[in-house]
């Protein structure tokens, strides 16, 4: 199930095993192109048609009534509501630390320069539905939008064949202060909010994970709206020393592998003994898991155990992968943290399991995948705000610098640019 590789001897084979290049099939691309075109040109009629085709229900009201949301909240287990509220408080508290302030400063000559930070007006949070429900995705997407000050936060999630939305998702929406909830899923939902219809508002940003059709739709509508990222399958890397607990490592690898057969889980360690113990433990425990077949397939196709010559080499391999989640099961994780650059989130020590970050700790669980942690960041308040430059040039400073600026424009061959300055100089 898990193959052991030795680094650097087996580097080529390891890279082949862990190749996470995203390739969307052409049939899916054509399907999404058709959906986007029809929704853009036909509006609600196309959205309803695709919902009937893909979700098996003819909707007459795409928006979930407030009464249905309130009923789901009232019927929920009070203990679960308390957990949701505490988790949302943790997530919100973390994201408050990301909030940016506008700034202004004065230069010589009475010039004032600055940057104004303003929230987006409307956001859509896409929350996956289907066989699994993820109220945690509601909280994680809503908290930074709320902290940013977004005026209207809409959420959409697929309904079942009877038109019902998972009550736990509705309860989470109530806790998170969502403005409006829609019972739509798939590429047609993304298109509806990206372009707007007679009944669905056009938003400024679409965030949240989904299947390949949702991912393709988000990629296609980027430019009409902002997006957070293109989410891929879940992934975790565990760096561990000889003193790590094998069962902790295995369960953390299983926690990613149970999501999807395409999920990836990798152990990197300088200890050959630990590598053997983890492989044996994984083989023994996989059959005891409810999603054992999915776990086995994921670890066989996309998992690995990597034995390195040193902890420094282990960090090098992790940076090569640039994982979504990185766990450090080592005696002093803070000691090796400076050697690590590329990861969506880093979990420090054996008690900081990735599940804590998924639900409760506070940092966002919407993270870059497929190696994009090299250049992308977790979902944050910054995704829901805009930065506007402020320039207040003074009369005296234009008199001092105007001709220099005009000559700069002359060198670029832009006459009107230069004259826009010179005409003002004549009035000084």
Curated annotation (Swiss-Prot):
Q: Which GO BP terms sit in this record? A: L-histidine biosynthetic process
Annotated cofactor note: Binds 1 zinc ion per subunit.
Q: Which residues bind substrate?
A: 234, 256, 259, 325, 358, 412, 417
Q: Name one GO cellular component term.
A: cytosol
| Keywords (A to Z) from UniProt | Amino-acid biosynthesis, Histidine biosynthesis, Metal-binding, NAD, Oxidoreductase, Zinc
Q: Which pathway is it part of?
A: Amino-acid biosynthesis; L-histidine biosynthesis; L-histidine from 5-phospho-alpha-D-ribose 1-diphosphate: step 9/9
Drop me one GO molecular function for this one: NAD binding
EC number, UniProt record: 1.1.1.23
- Going by the record, the broad EC class of this enzyme is oxidoreductase
Put simply, this protein is called Histidinol dehydrogenase
Q: Which organism is this entry from?
A: Chlorobaculum tepidum (strain ATCC 49652 / DSM 12025 / NBRC 103806 / TLS)
Gene expressing this chain: hisD
């Amino acid at each position: 199930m898990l193959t052991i590789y030795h680094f650097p001897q087996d580097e080529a084979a390891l890279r082949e095993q862990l190749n996470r290049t995203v390739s969307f099939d052409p049939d899916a691309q054509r399907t999404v192109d058709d959906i986007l075109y029809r929704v853009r040109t036909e509006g609600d009629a196309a959205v309803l048609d695709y919902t009937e085709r893909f979700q098996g229900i003819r909707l007459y009201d795409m928006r979930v009534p407030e009464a249905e949301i309130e009923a789901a909240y009232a019927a929920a287990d009070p203990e679960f509501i308390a957990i949701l509220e505490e988790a949302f408080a943790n997530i919100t508290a973390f994201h408050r630390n990301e909030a940016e302030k506008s700034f202004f400063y004065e230069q010589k000559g009475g010039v004032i320069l600055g940057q104004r930070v303003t929230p987006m007006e409307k956001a859509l949070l896409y929350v996956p539905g289907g066989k699994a429900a993820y109220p945690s995705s509601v909280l994680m997407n809503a908290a930074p939008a709320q902290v940013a000050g977004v005026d209207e936060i809409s959420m959409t999630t697929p309904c079942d064949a009877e038109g019902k939305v998972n009550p736990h998702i509705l309860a989470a929406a109530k806790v998170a202060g969502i403005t409006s909830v829609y019972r739509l899923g798939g590429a047609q939902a993304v298109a509806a909010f990206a372009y707007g219809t007679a009944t669905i508002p056009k938003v400024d940003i679409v965030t949240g994970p989904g299947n390949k059709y949702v991912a393709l739709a988000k990629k296609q509508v980027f430019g009409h709206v902002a997006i957070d990222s293109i989410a891929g399958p879940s992934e975790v890397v565990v760096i561990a020393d000889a003193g790590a607990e094998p069962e902790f490592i295995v369960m953390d690898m299983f926690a990613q592998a149970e999501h999807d057969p395409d999920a990836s889980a990798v152990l990197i360690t300088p200890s050959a003994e630990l590598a053997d113990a983890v492989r044996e433990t994984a083989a023994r425990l996989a059959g005891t898991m409810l999603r054992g077949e999915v776990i086995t397939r994921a670890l066989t196709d996309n998992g690995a155990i990597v034995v390195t010559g040193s902890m420094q080499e282990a960090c090098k391999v992790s940076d090569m992968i640039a994982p979504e989640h990185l766990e450090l099961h080592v005696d002093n994780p803070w000691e090796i943290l400076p050697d690590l650059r590329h990861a969506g989130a880093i979990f420090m020590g054996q008690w900081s399991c990735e599940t804590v970050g998924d639900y409760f700790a506070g940092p966002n669980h919407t993270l870059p995948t497929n190696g994009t942690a090299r250049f992308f960041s977790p979902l944050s308040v910054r995704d829901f705000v805009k930065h506007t430059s402020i320039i207040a040039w003074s009369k005296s400073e234009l008199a001092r610098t105007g001709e220099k600026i005009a000559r700069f424009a002359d060198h670029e061959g832009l006459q009107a640019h230069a004259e826009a300055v010179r005409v003002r100089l004549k009035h000084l």
